């Protein structure tokens, strides 16, 4: 089996669908199968680190990529992959009136989350903030963070840290915020993923969300992924 590391998104990938937070039983069983096979599983999420670590504990996962790649928790140590003070950015974002803040923001450091109040909220924030910041939607929230960091940069950092080639890392995701990690690894997009996620992935499975994740794990365990 060529796959050494499996990086998996949370919302929309381990859940029953892209519009629910309820975890998929099929996905949980597939996670266990991957761990039992000796694959190192990493949770990669847009959520804040504290929340991500709590969820990861119940999933039997130790390592976490949080805030869309801004923070990595590896072997009990947290690493910051970007820098800067987001307080002024937050004030500017809220002054537009096109979003409201997520309750998680008080626990977030670099990637701030917002609930859209208008359909054009992403475009409006991109115009206001300019090229120094990334503004994108996960399907659950709008995220704003410094440019130059995403789940893909975090996966590449992880590969260097662990001494594992990126082609021996599989990833599974469903949304635009997963494009980076799907591009730099052996990426799987679930069947109901966004067009951008499907385009970035090497493999698009048939099943949606948690069922699709199960299908991806089956392919990985059968040796059908992570070839150079």
Swiss-Prot record:
The keyword Hydrolase applies. InterPro entries: HAD-like_sf (IPR036412), HAD_sf (IPR023214), PGPase (IPR006382). Pfam families: Hydrolase_3. Mg(2+) binds at residues 9, 11, 174, 178. Belongs to the archaeal SPP-like hydrolase family. It comes from Pyrobaculum aerophilum (strain ATCC 51768 / DSM 7523 / JCM 9630 / CIP 104966 / NBRC 100827 / IM2). The active site is at residue 9. Its cofactor is Mg(2+). This is Phosphoglycolate phosphatase. It is an enzyme of class 3 (hydrolase). Its EC number is 3.1.3.18. It catalyses: 2-phosphoglycolate + H2O = glycolate + phosphate. Substrate binds at residue 151. GO terms for molecular function: magnesium ion binding; phosphatase activity; phosphoglycolate phosphatase activity. Keywords: Carbohydrate metabolism, Hydrolase, Magnesium, Metal-binding. The keyword Metal-binding applies. Catalyzes the dephosphorylation of 2-phosphoglycolate.
């Amino acid at each position: 089996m060529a796959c050494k590391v499996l990086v998996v998104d949370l919302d929309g990938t381990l859940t029953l669908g892209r519009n629910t937070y309820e975890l998929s039983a099929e996905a949980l069983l597939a996670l266990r199968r991957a761990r039992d096979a000796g694959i190192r599983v990493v949770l990669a999420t847009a959520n804040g680190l504290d929340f991500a670590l709590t969820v990861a504990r119940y999933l039997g996962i130790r390592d976490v990529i949080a805030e869309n790649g801004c923070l990595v928790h590896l072997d009990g140590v947290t690493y910051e992959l970007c820098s800067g003070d987001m307080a002024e950015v937050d004030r500017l974002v809220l002054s537009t009136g096109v979003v409201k803040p997520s309750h998680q923001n008080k626990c977030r450091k670099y990637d701030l989350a917002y609930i859209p109040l208008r359909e054009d909220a992403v475009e409006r924030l991109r115009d206001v903030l300019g090229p120094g910041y990334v503004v994108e939607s996960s399907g659950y929230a709008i995220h704003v963070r410094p440019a130059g960091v995403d789940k893909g940069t975090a996966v590449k950092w992880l590969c260097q840290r662990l001494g594992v080639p990126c082609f021996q890392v599989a990833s599974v995701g469903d949304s635009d915020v997963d494009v980076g990690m799907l591009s730099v690894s052996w990426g799987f997009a679930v069947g109901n993923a966004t067009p951008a996620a499907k385009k970035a992935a090497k493999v698009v499975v048939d099943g949606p969300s948690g069922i699709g994740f199960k299908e991806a794990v089956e392919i990985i365990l059968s040796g059908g992924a992570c070839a150079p």
